[in-house]
Amino acid sequence: MTVSTAQMRFWSPEVRELEPYVPGEQPKIQNLLKLNTNENPYPPSPKVVEAVQEVLHEQADVLRLYPDPDATVLKQAIAKQQNIDVSQVFVGNGSDEVLAHIFKAFFLQDGPILYPDITYSFYPVYSQFFGTKTKEIPLNENFEIDVRDYTQPNGGVIITNPNAPTSIALSLAEIEQVLQANPDRVVVIDEAYVDFGAESAVSLINRYENLVVCQTTSKSRSLAGLRVGFAIAQSHLIAALEAVKNSFNSYPIDRFAIAAAVASFEDQAYFEEQCQKVITSREKLVRDLTELGFNVLPSKANFIFATHSQHDAGQLAQKLREQGIIVRYFNKPRINQFLRITVGTNEQNARLVQTLKQDIL
């Protein structure tokens, strides 16, 4: 939408300066292979479908009532699955909303918050939106986070682990180094992709009062369409998030989303099975692309980050699109020769590989 300067006179001055986040493309094209937004290729647990149907058909009358503002049953399900106390759980309308509350609750400090120069692109958006001071820390030449860079004075730290879009993960020992170096600042570990092979920092919660772990049901639990995210931390940090939430939107999660998420957390066997399928498919996709001449960064996510020395990444993305396959291309410094490719089913990955081999490379 184009808005004229004259029309912008109604806008707040700060809004005129915003550079909003650009979501991944959601095209409505038949027979399209969509490997650009890291959605799970498999459906949610059948128990999720049953739970949603129960709300719709057996509890329809309650839809006239507001949902539980605390989403208590969901917090209980998360606490049980993570083996923590319910007072250590915060829930929100997707992890993006949870992250927004985190920025408001903890990062309006005198010093700058630290995050990598190549990371989730919502961080600079939130920083601008809330007026947070920031300092971007360059990844090393191998696109890895050097935790020693996060020991300098700051107003807080946020790290995606595994990182996005690079897919590379830190160890728990490295995360502990960051926590120990910043005892008076909040350290946020954004674990949107942690269930695909990385180590979760949730196990460190009771040892570090400055740690917040943020997760989502969108990736590993196939619930991107329902928007349920959560944070785990000691109760004094959760209290700050609740204060922000109840100053913004007291009812962030609807009844369908609560029921679906609870059912997902209660079906651990299905969750683990689907995660392993993605991991196995990822490993084969890496092998296949490597044979085609791609250099693929070591991935612990449900996507890979790959470059080809003989082919321009932007042109590859365009040629794939012409063949009905969409991947994510970032026209940004340092990564403009990489493609981020979501791991699909074995059949979807095979279509990608065959298209590259027969029609493009």
UniProtKB/Swiss-Prot annotation:
Necessary cofactors: pyridoxal 5'-phosphate
EC number in record: 2.6.1.9
Enzyme class: transferase
Keywords: Amino-acid biosynthesis, Aminotransferase, Histidine biosynthesis, Pyridoxal phosphate, Transferase
GO molecular function, one term: histidinol-phosphate transaminase activity
InterPro entries xref list: Aminotransferase_I/II_large, HisP_aminotrans, HistidinolP_aminotransfase, PyrdxlP-dep_Trfase, PyrdxlP-dep_Trfase_major, PyrdxlP-dep_Trfase_small
PTM annotation (N6-(pyridoxal phosphate)lysine): residues: 219
Record's subunit section: Homodimer.
PANTHER family: HISTIDINOL-PHOSPHATE AMINOTRANSFERASE, HISTIDINOL-PHOSPHATE AMINOTRANSFERASE 2
Name of the protein described by the UniProt record: Histidinol-phosphate aminotransferase
Lineage of producing organism: Bacteria, Pseudomonadati, Pseudomonadota, Gammaproteobacteria, Moraxellales
